[in-house]
Amino acid sequence: MLGSNTFKNMQRRHTTLREKGRRQAIRGPAYMFNEKGTSLTPEEERFLDSAEYGNIPVVRKMLEESKTLNFNCVDYMGQNALQLAVGNEHLEVTELLLKKENLARVGDALLLAISKGYVRIVEAILSHPAFAQGQRLTLSPLEQELRDDDFYAYDEDGTRFSHDITPIILAAHCQEYEIVHILLLKGARIERPHDYFCKCNECTEKQRKDSFSHSRSRMNAYKGLASAAYLSLSSEDPVLTALELSNELARLANIETEFKNDYRKLSMQCKDFVVGVLDLCRDTEEVEAILNGDVNLQVWSDHHRPSLSRIKLAIKYEVKKFVAHPNCQQQLLTMWYENLSGLRQQSIAVKFLAVFGVSIGLPFLAIAYWIAPCSKLGQTLRSPFMKFVAHAVSFTIFLGLLVVNASDRFEGVKTLPNETFTDYPKQIFRVKTTQFSWTEMLIMKWVLGMIWSECKEIWEEGPREYVLHLWNLLDFGMLSIFVASFTARFMAFLKASEAQLYVDQYVQDVTLHNVSLPPEVAYFTYARDKWWPSDPQIISEGLYAIAVVLSFSRIAYILPANESFGPLQISLGRTVKDIFKFMVIFIMVFVAFMIGMFNLYSYYRGAKYNPAFTTVEESFKTLFWSIFGLSEVISVVLKYDHKFIENIGYVLYGVYNVTMVVVLLNMLIAMINNSYQEIEEDADVEWKFARAKLWLSYFDEGRTLPAPFNLVPSPKSFYYLIMRIKMCLIELCQSKAKRCENDLEMGMLNSKFRKTRYQAGMRNSENLTANSTFSKPTRYQKIMKRLIKRYVLKAQVDRENDEVNEGELKEIKQDISSLRYELLEEKSQATGELADLIQQLSEKFGKNLNKDHLRVNQGKDI
């Protein structure tokens, strides 16, 4: 019984498999396209074949003569005749089909022609009545589908491209300059997507309905906006548009991390476009137009120096190839040696002598500039190179003062920590130690001068721009620590002076050895070993040491000026960034083992051979110095026979050393090596970009004199102050007059005079608007038009010089096929005409022969 059931089950399974195989065989490999609705008549099949292969005579004849032909019929793939003709670049067939009314899927044919770059077919389709209003060019296929029809549909399943792809977006994606120009003239535009965090109803609804489609639509729009074809032809200022768009795309790369690579690629595409336009400049005028923007709207300084707004923007957005481009660097170098044109071609020795001369005569040069800032010498000192040299010399002197201030302790201090030393018997010891020396007084003057310079920079740039530069933060920290150090030192001096005043008033003895003083006074007579840990002088000395370290580290700021040291400084900065990234993992591992080891050994304080791990502080010190091999294994050994605790300590300590030293430190070394290799591979661009940032900080007007010479205001400063006060008073008077006029106009609101005046004002504003609309292009616009024209021509030439690909070979094949059908048609027409002529001749000759035969017969009869 069991065997019979098993046999029946196996037989049923084989029957099922045979039926399934039979169904698959019936469906065949093209089952997906064998739908009932796609059956065609022989006439329709011939019509579609003729449209596909460019048989113009057959298509024309069938469209003109056939009464039953459905010219919107589709093949097995769902394509109609128009789509087949466009896909195979048959212009004449397309023009014949476009003459028919109610032609379907014209929009998809347009998208197909754009994707293949068929310019003439695009022009023919755009002349179709469906595009008369131009509204269809601004709507996406999805919006068209929601409104009325399948205008952009590939088949009944939808469009062949994404639902958000408009013709102008597709043309921009394909870098079709001519098609983009045609669509722009038709009024098509690419709408910039809303901000990523936009909460409007439209964005909220799209995000809720399909977040993926919403993100893809944003990506497609940005691809169109970032294309060189659209940037070149749609914007009045393509350079500014490309720079701002590159920054926006770089910001989106950090926000939409799932599309990070795509956004970074688009951002780099915008940067390459700007570099390409700059590369096409042929003279200084064009380079200045690129670097400064619209020169007619540019605010020039009193000394006729441009603001270099585009370079500042490129540096802010880190468009390094643009800033490091030879055209840009040559212009910056010319401005760098402004008023010193002869020095640029001199040797290094001559330049060194010039720097040495400035170092020696800096005080005298400062006095000369105070007296005559507009003289030839003043103009020379205002040149960026001389400003850089003056500031570098001033800072070098400041560092020298720091060294001199510590020179008296190079061989060790004379007074030990447990000793005191005074100038006279009744002098308080702390009065002598807290007094400021002459070098410290000079250092304070330099610090005040640098603080004033930083305040002016904050005033000119604004706090937001100021904090974006790391060197500004370093300067701010260094100066703040110096101020805190000197403040603490001054507070200690005040307290010591108060103690000295008490001694001078109330102590009558000659010395202070046997005098009983109040505790608050006696404290200032103690040696250093008895000072409180929170003593202001101790805090001052600690802060001063930190400030000195930061001061010497600031030398790296001027290193990019040198070609040899510049790349090293850049590599050092990148290394610091890698260390900060590494610190996240390092701190996580370090804290984990520190807390674990502390919990393990905190109960054994006094029961170990050293105090390691018995407190949090000792745990930190032991683990930190263990990284550098300065901790001993005995740190985990106990005096008691608690082997379990010791074994766990050995294991944890060993795992820590393996993790930190073998794994993490080697990973940090690999990261640093990788960063250095990246800098070395593009060292020239990185160095020139860093040098341009350094140069640009000296191009702005003002801050000519370095610290501490900038503390004394020059006559020019008083003149600028008076002019600024004058402008403020004028603006105040004008605002009051305008307010009074507005009050008067409000009183005459219902009068006839008010109405007449309002109408006259409206007419004047309309005239001004019309004049501004039809005004002549500015010099900057002419230059940009010239450059963009070169860029477009170069792009087209580069595209034509590419190798012939498979698509172009297919186009040639289709053209030959169309030509063959045309020749066959002409041959058939010629053959028909020849047959008609032969028939006519035969008929004519037949009539003549009959007449001759009759004459002969009549003659015989006669």
From Swiss-Prot:
Post-translational modification comment from the UniProt entry: Phosphorylation by PRKG1 at Thr-15 negatively regulates TRPC7 activity.
Main location: membrane
Superkingdom, taxonomy of origin: Eukaryota
Residue intervals on the Cytoplasmic side: 1-351, 405-465, 559-581, 673-862
Keyword match Transmembrane helix: yes
Membrane-spanning segments: 352-372, 384-404, 466-486, 538-558, 582-602, 652-672
GO biological process, one term: manganese ion transport
One Pfam family of this chain: Ank_2
InterPro entries listed in its UniProt record: Ankyrin_rpt, Ankyrin_rpt-contain_sf, Ion_trans_dom, TRP_dom, TRPC7_channel, TRPC_channel
Glycan-modified residues: N514
Entry's Gene Ontology cellular component terms: membrane; nuclear envelope; perinuclear region of cytoplasm; plasma membrane
Catalyzed reactions: Ca(2+)(in) = Ca(2+)(out)
Topological domains annotated Extracellular: 373-383, 487-537, 603-651
Start-end of Basic residues biased regions: 10-21
Keywords attached to this entry: ANK repeat, Calcium, Calcium channel, Calcium transport, Cell membrane, Glycoprotein, Ion channel, Ion transport, Membrane, Nucleus, Phosphoprotein, Repeat, Transmembrane, Transmembrane helix, Transport
Sequence segments annotated as region (Disordered): 1-21
Family, as annotated: Belongs to the transient receptor (TC 1.A.4) family. STrpC subfamily. TRPC7 sub-subfamily.
Subunit structure: Interacts with MX1 and RNF24. Interacts (via ANK-repeat domains) with PRKG1.
Protein name according to UniProt: Short transient receptor potential channel 7
Organism expressing this protein natively: Mus musculus (Mouse)
